[in-house]
Curated annotation (Swiss-Prot):
InterPro entries: ATPase_P-typ_cyto_dom_N, ATPase_P-typ_P_site, ATPase_P-typ_TM_dom_sf, ATPase_P-typ_transduc_dom_A_sf, Cation_Transport_ATPase_IB, HAD_sf, HMA_dom, HMA_dom_sf
Topological category with respect to the lipid bilayer: Multi-pass membrane protein
Any Gene Ontology CC annotation: vacuolar membrane
Protein name: Putative inactive cadmium/zinc-transporting ATPase HMA3
Lineage: Eukaryota, Viridiplantae, Streptophyta, Embryophyta, Tracheophyta
Gene responsible for this protein: HMA3
Spans through the membrane: 90-111, 115-134, 142-162, 164-184, 311-333, 342-359
Top-level division of the source organism's lineage: Eukaryota
């Protein structure tokens, strides 16, 4: 009982942090050491390529800003990531890098005015502070990272009085760090776009109050208007509509929803008004589970990555020993041109940093997983990517993978001798201009492609019938457009629809046009193949 009461008092929240100080997997243990000492942190995970730390914490005990403070005490440069941030903000280099670069360029004019040579030293001082701070933090944790190795190289270069070269090392390292941070930021945007699929607010049907989805419990009835995203998984208890489920299923054709129909968060109500009784909490919805799967896949390590991480423990000391040998052995052997050997030692020290080796595999894996996620593919782990090299048979889902998941009109015909094709297409496209259905967009585009310009202003009494079609009065005619069920609403008593369907090819969606109770036209919609699919399948077979 005591344990149950304690869990009720907790208010767990998942927060996302951008941690610029994570340059490779060796910093994961540093993050772990910091967060394990923080009271209120229940669990955490680190995604190295995007420099993301995900923390589940009790907000009664610790806030996201306090977690940031704890991480920054270890010089990890952490910040709270706004929920669902999807806009790519332009990131400028740090002021240290900019000032260092300007002074370095000015120092190159020393050949015209020799005192400008000293600007190189000022460039080192201006740009070395971030490197120095991170290097000190690394050494105090008994670790040698790229910042410590670079700082040693800069100090040694200054001792050799190669001021311009020292400034160049500082500037190039700062620029490289900025480019890496920008790449990590772009990667994190992908994860944020998945998080933002579902809305963060829901409207309670009984009161009309708008609340956070995290506050909505199970069996709560929420209302969803036309054009809005469904906030939480549930069952329709009132109303009807067509729902676009393309974000989750990849299927381009909207699904009709009636009473007792199941709906999912992040899908879009295209028309109609519905009330939904929730069947899950926001954190347990399908879209939340999908995001969780992607996070787990990004955190998982491939066999190659685990092997590289294991080797990297011994790689850094080996680099330092190798650099020391290049510097010390020539001195012991009393060889000439010692400055050349010192220079080689510095090259080994800087270029031999393990960060590039450690990051190579996880970055490639991360890019593959995130690109797949945004394209509609969920890959369980990084090991699955390595397994792809050994597969013999591939099975593809058609919609959204082989096809574009967008409708296009493949056939449009008039079934009445008294109504020509252009006249019928003019009526249909004008009425469909008032509809938000994906089928409407395809018909409008088709009309314009054959030089028929729709005029929605002349359409009267437009009505939408979810799961059936639409109605509009134009030029004195009552026009019904939709699927087979629209016939009954149009007053058609003869069952001539199956005869038309028998002439259609499989894989096409069939639409019907009624003028009053008379069937006057039909059209076919299909989901066209993606560009390059045939070539891709041919290459896979080869």
């Amino acid at each position: 009982m005591a344990e149950g009461e304690e869990s009720k008092k907790m208010n767990l929240q998942t927060s996302y942090f951008d941690v610029v100080g994570i340059c490779c997997s060796s910093e994961v243990s540093i993050v772990g050491n910091v967060l394990r000492q923080v009271d209120g942190v229940k669990e955490f995970s680190v995604i190295v390529p995007s420099r993301t730390v995900i923390v589940v914490h009790d907000t009664f005990l610790i806030s996201p800003l306090q977690i940031v403070k704890a991480l920054n005490q270890a010089r990890l440069e952490a910040s709270v990531r706004p929920y669902g941030e999807t806009s790519l903000k332009s990131q400028w280099p740090s002021p240290f890098a900019i000032v260092s670069g300007v002074l370095l360029v000015l120092s190159f004019f020393k050949y015209f005015y020799s005192p400008l040579e000293w600007l190189a030293i000022v460039a080192v001082v201006a740009g070395v502070f971030p490197i120095l701070a991170k290097a000190v933090a690394s050494v105090t944790r008994f670790r040698l990272d790229i910042n410590a190795l670079t700082l040693i190289a800069v100090i040694a270069t200054l001792c050799m009085q190669d001021f311009t070269e020292a400034a160049t090392i500082v500037f190039l390292f700062s620029v490289a760090d900025w480019l890496e941070s920008s790449a990590a930021h772009k990667a994190s945007i992908v994860m944020s776009s998945l998080m933002s699929l579902a809305p963060r607010k829901a409207v309670i049907a009984d009161t009309g109050l708008e609340v956070d989805v995290d506050e909505v419990g199970i069996n709560t009835v929420v209302s969803v208007k036309a054009g809005e995203s469904i906030p939480i998984d549930g069952v329709v208890v009132d109303g009807s509509c067509d729902v676009d489920e393309k974000t989750l299923t990849g299927e381009s054709f909207p699904v009709s929803k009636q009473r007792e129909s199941t709906v999912m968060a992040a899908t879009i109500n295209l028309n109609g008004y519905i009330k939904v009784k929730t069947t899950a909490l926001a954190r347990d919805c399908v879209v939340a589970k999908m995001t969780k799967l992607v996070e787990e896949a990004q955190k998982s390590q491939t066999k190659t990555q685990r092997f590289i991480d294991k080797c990297s423990r011994y790689y850094t000391p080996a680099v330092v020993v190798s650099a020391a040998c290049f510097a010390v052995i020539p001195v012991l052997l009393k060889v000439q041109d010692l400055s050349h050997w010192f220079h080689l030692a510095l090259v080994v020290l800087v270029s031999g940093c393990p960060c590039g080796l450690i990051l190579s595999t996880p970055v490639a894996t991360f890019c593959a997983l995130t690109k797949a996620a945004t394209s509609g593919f969920l890959i369980k782990t990084g090991d699955c990517l390595e397994t792809l090299a050994k597969i013999k048979i591939v099975a593809f889902d058609k919609t959204g993978t082989i096809t574009k998941a967008e409708f296009m009109v493949s056939d449009f015909r008039s079934l009445s001798p008294s109504i020509n094709l252009h006249k019928l297409l003019y009526w249909v496209s004008s009425i469909e201009c008032k509809s938000s259905h994906p089928m409407a967009a395809a018909l409008i585009d088709y009309a314009r492609s054959v030089s028929v310009e729709p005029k929605p202003d002349i359409v009267e009494n437009f009505q939408n019938f979810p799961g059936e079609g639409v109605y509009g009065r134009i030029d004195g005619q009552d026009i019904y457009i939709g699927n087979k069920r629209i016939a009954q609403r149009a007053g058609c008593l003869t069952d001539n629809v199956p005869d038309i369907e028998a002439t259609m090819k499989r894989g096409k969606t069939i639409g019907y046009i009624y003028m009053g109770a008379k069937l006057t036209g039909s059209f076919n919609l299909l989901d066209g193949c993606r560009y390059g699919v045939a070539q891709a399948l041919k290459e896979l077979k080869s």
